[in-house]
Structures are given as structure tokens and as C-alpha cells.
Amino acid sequence: MLTYQTWEAEEKPSFPHDNETKGALDVLTWAFRQYKDDIVYACSFGVEGIVLIDLISQVKPDAEIVFLDTGLHFRETYKTIEKVKEKYPSLRIVMKKPSLSLEEQAQQLGDELWKHNPNKCCELRKVIPLREALTGITAWISGLRREQSPTRSHVEYINKDDKFKSIKICPLIHWTWKDVWNYVYKRRLPYNVLHDRGYPSIGCEPCTSPALDPNDLRSGRWVGHGKTECGLHIS
């Protein structure tokens, strides 16, 4: 089995991406056969996440989905999660919370940490909780697409994840923004209504604005901080 420890020795599978799902369904089928219950999907419930959930449900209807519940998400995001639960009742959706409540974080590190040290806030409320969720897990699935940003342009279907000492599976690497929405409309999938209000990328409410640049899907994230990633996808 391909693991973080056996990465160098194991042969990596290849997948064609000239089919209807651009390889995504083939990648997911391989991943769940390979790892069975030893793989989770870390989902933010943005539109790419909805596509992946629908694809995953076709391969493993009772897959485990982890949502990093920072306590700072938009009301609309929580409503989206409820809609997903209704549509896919067999999925095991885990709401993973940080060890520190927002009140405890404020007491220890000051009010509104995201304003004066967003990297620390992301570490406490996203990176550490995901590391905890992946403890004992061999692989995890992510909705990264190469088109999303320069920092994601070289991601592969199967990646050695040095950050979490894991295997990271990215089925949507060849999908475009148009592909994502065509799939959502064709399948009539629920999605976060903030996408219709100028938010192509949605994270925590204090650190997410409508996109400043329509050609940069992540230009509304951490505006003014010179930051476009929460740290989950940076080694």
C-alpha cells in the first residue's frame, strides 16, 4: 500500500484525464479501494467540495467527511452543510473543533487574533485540528485545483504530504472553474449561496471578502495580510 513511509519505494498509479470527470472518479475509486476506511475527506463545503462529495458518494456512500469547524464560519456555510446532510444521509460528517474555544483563544492571545496574527489563528483553528483528525489515518482527500492559484499549480492526483506525514489525494486537479459549475448545475447540487454574491472562495467570515480580482478566485481571502493560504497546503 502506498503510504507516506513507502512513498519512495512504491510505484504511483497514473490516471487518464480525458474522460467526463477528468480522472476524478478513477482517482477516488482507486483511493477507496487502496485505503478503505483509512482515508478521510477534509472539506470546506465550498463549491469544489460539493462536487467532490457528490463524486465520493458514488464510490463510497458512507465515507468520512471532516469539516474544520473554527467557530468563525459564515451562517450560510453551516446551512450548506445541513443541505448536504439531507442529500447524502449515509456520509459521516465530522465537525472537528479546535481545542481552544474562541473565548479561551482571546484570553490567551488577545481579541480577534485573526486581525493581528492570522497565521497563528489558522494554525490553532485549522492546521492543528486537521493534524488531530488525520492521526492514525494514511491518506486524505482535498479539493485543490491547479487553476486556483500559483501555489496550487503543480499539485498532482497523488501527493506526498510532508505537512501531515500523509498521502494527499487531489482528484480535481484538471477541473476548471467552469467545469465545477457545469457539474453542479447538471447534477442540481446544493451549494453555498455566497458563491452567488461574489465569493468564489469561502473560508472564515472575518477573513473572507468578495473577490477583489475576478481573475483571481482567492483574492478575497485575508485581504491586506499578503496571505492566500491557511497553511493546510503549505509544507
From Swiss-Prot:
Keywords: Cytoplasm, Iron, Iron-sulfur, Metal-binding, Oxidoreductase. Pathway: Sulfur metabolism; hydrogen sulfide biosynthesis; sulfite from sulfate. [4Fe-4S] cluster binds at C121, C122, C204, C207. Its EC number is 1.8.4.10. It catalyses: [thioredoxin]-disulfide + sulfite + AMP + 2 H(+) = adenosine 5'-phosphosulfate + [thioredoxin]-dithiol. GO terms for cellular component: cytoplasm. NCBIfam families: APS_reductase, cysH, PRK02090.1. PANTHER family: PHOSPHOADENOSINE PHOSPHOSULFATE REDUCTASE (PTHR46509:SF1). Catalyzes the formation of sulfite from adenosine 5'-phosphosulfate (APS) using thioredoxin as an electron donor. This is Adenosine 5'-phosphosulfate reductase. It comes from Geobacillus sp. (strain WCH70). The lineage of its organism: Bacteria, Bacillati, Bacillota, Bacilli, Bacillales.
